[in-house]
């Protein structure tokens, strides 16, 4: 199962906000060094969860040294999935899942940032609102508030 998310950029703070679609919860803005950051729950976040990275809204496994789970990050508009992503990405994610050396966390972070921001910059959309799907992962958001279940079990 996968969760549907609203992904909205707040240009005044350069904060990426993720909220569940159609849920009563409004979620919280997630930000890096440019804005406030909610304290993560210790039970959900391993020691190497990648808190130093600027991108928020991916599950904790995305930047773990053990590698991410099988990720499928999909833009409902441009279908930027691991299927039609740069050829090496599915292999990279698979290798990291197995704990093998692969792309650096910076490379993976850059790929997901491109998925989110490229269309906004090129199309100049004023609403800057997208719907993304992330499936096949048992982890929660790095900064997810405890009552909000953004992602479901695989």
UniProtKB/Swiss-Prot annotation:
GO terms for biological process: DNA-templated transcription; symbiont-mediated activation of host NF-kappaB cascade; symbiont-mediated arrest of host cell cycle during G2/M transition; viral genome replication. Its main location: host cell. It comes from the Viruses. A fraction may be phosphorylated in insect cells and HepG2 cells, a human hepatoblastoma cell line. Phosphorylated in vitro by host protein kinase C or mitogen-activated protein kinase. N-acetylated in insect cells. GO terms for cellular component: host cell mitochondrion; host cell nucleus. Keywords: Activation of host NF-kappa-B by virus, Activator, Apoptosis, Host cytoplasm, Host G2/M cell cycle arrest by virus, Host mitochondrion, Host nucleus, Host-virus interaction, Modulation of host cell cycle by virus, Transcription, Transcription regulation. It is found in: Host cytoplasm; Host nucleus; Host mitochondrion. Residues 68-117 are annotated as: Mitochondrial targeting sequence. May form homodimer. May interact with host CEBPA, CFLAR, CREB1, DDB1, E4F1, HBXIP, HSPD1/HSP60, NFKBIA, POLR2E and SMAD4. Interacts with host SMC5-SMC6 complex and induces its degradation. Interacts with host TRPC4AP; leading to prevent ubiquitination of TRPC4AP. Interacts with host PLSCR1; this interaction promotes ubiquitination and degradation of HBx and impairs HBx-mediated cell proliferation. Belongs to the orthohepadnavirus protein X family. Multifunctional protein that plays a role in silencing host antiviral defenses and promoting viral transcription. Does not seem to be essential for HBV infection. May be directly involved in development of cirrhosis and liver cancer (hepatocellular carcinoma). Most of cytosolic activities involve modulation of cytosolic calcium. The effect on apoptosis is controversial depending on the cell types in which the studies have been conducted. May induce apoptosis by localizing in mitochondria and causing loss of mitochondrial membrane potential. This is Protein X. The gene is X.
């Amino acid at each position: 199962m996968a969760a549907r998310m609203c992904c909205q950029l707040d240009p005044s703070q350069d904060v990426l906000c993720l909220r569940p679609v159609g849920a009563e919860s409004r979620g919280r803005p997630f930000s890096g060094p440019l804005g406030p950051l909610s304290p993560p729950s210790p039970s959900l976040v391993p020691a190497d969860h990648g808190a130093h990275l600027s991108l928020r809204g991916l599950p904790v496994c995305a930047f773990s040294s053990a590698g991410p789970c099988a990720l499928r990050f999909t833009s409902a508009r441009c279908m930027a999935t691991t299927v039609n992503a740069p050829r090496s990405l599915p292999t990279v994610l698979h290798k990291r899942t197995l704990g093998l050396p692969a792309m650096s966390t910076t490379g993976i972070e850059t790929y997901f940032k491109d998925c989110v921001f490229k269309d906004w910059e090129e199309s100049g959309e004023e609403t800057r609102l997208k719907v993304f799907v992330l499936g096949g992962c048992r982890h929660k958001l790095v900064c997810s508030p405890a009552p909000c279940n953004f992602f479901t079990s695989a």
